[in-house]
């Protein structure tokens, strides 16, 4: 083979190899692009399939950019449909409660800028849980924190952070409020915020960050609401509000709200005599609330809300082991399901309970007279049998030597069931701890578990002698 032939042969082989490599690169590029587009391909409905006509919200479109061998390819990710929550799954079967979260706000206040708060609660959107509280318009290490034992001032605002994040200076102030409730309907947050003069307060209804509706005081005597989460089913949210005396008959109404707009108001009906600070949970197809009777009963009122026809039924928790504070000792206390027990009914504390078939799970202070300690347990027959007192699965959340406060319920939807969780307010400062001039709180949070669990105590834990005065 002469030199020219060798050159031609080598060139031909090189060209062939280069062509093969080029074709392979094209094949790889085509395969990569095809697989990427297929991953985000929007499925179209088959022919003749009927699609729902009700309004839906589509999240803001997102564009994904992929770089392949210096070529930019853009493909729009499919819009994600956002639907109202319906809470139709069954309630989770539990054996008790396991620790979930603790924010340690008071301990952190000894060396950092943390808000002075009270009336905390927890609520979750479909993807994340948040903690709320009513701030006093000041941090703890600030002279404005003096005399923050007062409940109602124009400086109080509703604070909102991810659960477990203390209320630092960067915390969002959702609205002006000295009484509040919040819930997520599956599409956006609803906040009910009460503020103003005691004799002529205003409740603002804020949905998706916008003021949508409002209502003024109807009895001119401290309009107030739940201090825990409201509940939304298929786009209709319910919130229990009371206006009137805290120690005699008051005027309680249940408001039905759709995307921030009041669509109906129902008066309280049934045998409950006094209803305040309800802890509500979804009980499909309705809403159930366990509340505070601040007039006649140390047994807790129950309010059942029908979301479809706006009807209301009320009664009392049947358990003879009653949930309010103050109360009689367990030997002497009673409850017969329908009426207040007239046992140390004047005064009380926000609390919770929820039904489990014929039984009831509940939490309460360990002390019968003061907001000290906290315990949970199940009462067999406590939801259906008058004066039932068989207690099982008792747990200590806060030992009796430490302070507690308000407590309330919130619900979390899992893959197959709805779990019940609760929080406990851990109050510190005035009136009991007179070394300091402020009153504030931290929280501890537990959730239902079907597993096993141990024992412990989870108090606030701050050494009052180390705290700013």
From Swiss-Prot:
Keywords: Calcium, Disulfide bond, Glycoprotein, Glycosidase, Host cell membrane, Host membrane, Hydrolase, Membrane, Metal-binding, Signal-anchor, Transmembrane, Transmembrane helix, Virion. HAMAP family: INFV_NRAM (MF_04071). It is an enzyme of class 3 (hydrolase). It is found in: Virion membrane; Host apical cell membrane. Substrate binds at residues 118, 152, 276-277, 292, 371. The influenza A genome consist of 8 RNA segments. Genetic variation of hemagglutinin and/or neuraminidase genes results in the emergence of new influenza strains. The mechanism of variation can be the result of point mutations or the result of genetic reassortment between segments of two different strains. Belongs to the glycosyl hydrolase 34 family. Its main location: virion. Residues 1-9 are intravirion. GO terms for cellular component: host cell plasma membrane; membrane; virion membrane. It catalyses: Hydrolysis of alpha-(2->3)-, alpha-(2->6)-, alpha-(2->8)- glycosidic linkages of terminal sialic acid residues in oligosaccharides, glycoproteins, glycolipids, colominic acid and synthetic substrates. Residues 11-33 are annotated as: Involved in apical transport and lipid raft association. N-glycosylated. Ca(2+) binds at residues 293, 297, 324. Glycans are attached at residues 61, 70, 86, 146, 200, 234, 402. Catalyzes the removal of terminal sialic acid residues from viral and cellular glycoconjugates. Cleaves off the terminal sialic acids on the glycosylated HA during virus budding to facilitate virus release. Additionally helps virus spread through the circulation by further removing sialic acids from the cell surface. These cleavages prevent self-aggregation and ensure the efficient spread of the progeny virus from cell to cell. Otherwise, infection would be limited to one round of replication. The keyword tRNA-binding does not apply. Inhibited by the neuraminidase inhibitors zanamivir (Relenza) and oseltamivir (Tamiflu). These drugs interfere with the release of progeny virus from infected cells and are effective against all influenza strains. Resistance to neuraminidase inhibitors is quite rare. The active site is at residues 151, 406. Residues 91-469 are annotated as: Head of neuraminidase. This is Neuraminidase. The keyword Nucleus does not apply. It comes from the Viruses.
């Amino acid at each position: 083979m002469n030199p020219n032939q060798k050159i031609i042969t080598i060139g031909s082989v090189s060209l062939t190899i280069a062509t093969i490599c080029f074709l392979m690169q094209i094949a790889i590029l085509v395969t990569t692009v095809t697989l990427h587009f297929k991953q985000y391909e929007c499925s179209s409905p088959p022919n003749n399939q009927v699609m729902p006509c009700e309004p839906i919200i589509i999240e803001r479109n997102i564009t994904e950019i992929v770089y392949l061998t210096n070529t930019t390819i853009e493909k729009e990710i499919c819009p994600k449909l956002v639907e109202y929550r319906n809470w139709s799954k069954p309630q989770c079967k539990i054996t008790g409660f396991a620790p979930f979260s603790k924010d340690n706000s008071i301990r952190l206040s000894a060396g950092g800028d943390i808000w002075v708060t009270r009336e905390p609660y927890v609520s979750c959107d479909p993807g994340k849980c948040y903690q709320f509280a009513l701030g006093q318009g000041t941090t703890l290490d600030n002279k404005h924190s003096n005399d923050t034992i007062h409940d109602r001032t124009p400086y109080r605002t509703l604070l909102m952070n991810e659960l477990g994040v203390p209320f630092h200076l960067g915390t969002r102030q959702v609205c002006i409020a000295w009484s509040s409730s919040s819930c997520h309907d599956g599409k956006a947050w609803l906040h009910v915020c009460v503020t103003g003069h005691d004799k002529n307060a205003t409740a603002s209804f804020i949905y998706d960050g916008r003021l949508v509706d409002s209502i003024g005081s109807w009895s001119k005597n401290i309009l107030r609401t739940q201090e825990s989460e409201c509940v939304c089913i298929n786009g209709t949210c319910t919130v229990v509000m009371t206006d009137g005396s805290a120690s005699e008959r008051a005027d309680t109404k249940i408001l039905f709200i759709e995307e921030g707009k009041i669509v109906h108001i129902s008066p309280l009906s049934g045998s409950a005599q006094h209803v305040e600070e309800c802890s509500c949970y979804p009980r499909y197809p309705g809403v159930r609330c366990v509340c505070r009777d601040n007039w006649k009963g140390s047994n807790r009122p129950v309010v059942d809300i029908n979301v479809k026809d706006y009807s209301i039924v009320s009664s009392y928790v049947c358990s003879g082991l009653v949930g309010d504070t103050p109360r009689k000792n367990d030997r002497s206390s009673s409850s017969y399901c329908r009426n207040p027990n007239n046992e140390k009914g004047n005064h009380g504390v926000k609390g919770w309970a929820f039904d489990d078939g014929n039984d009831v799970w509940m939490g309460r202070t360990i002390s019968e007279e003061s907001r000290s300690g906290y315990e949970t347990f199940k009462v067999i027959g406590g939801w259906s049998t008058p004066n039932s007192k068989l207690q099982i699965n008792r747990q200590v959340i806060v030992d009796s030597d430490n302070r507690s406060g308000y407590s309330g319920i919130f619900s979390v939807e899992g893959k197959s069931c709805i779990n019940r969780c609760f929080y406990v307010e851990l109050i510190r400062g005035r009136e009991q701890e007179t070394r300091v001039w402020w009153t504030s709180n931290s929280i501890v949070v537990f959730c239902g578990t079907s597993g096993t669990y141990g024992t412990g105590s989870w108090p606030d834990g701050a050494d009052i002698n180390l705290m700013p005065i």
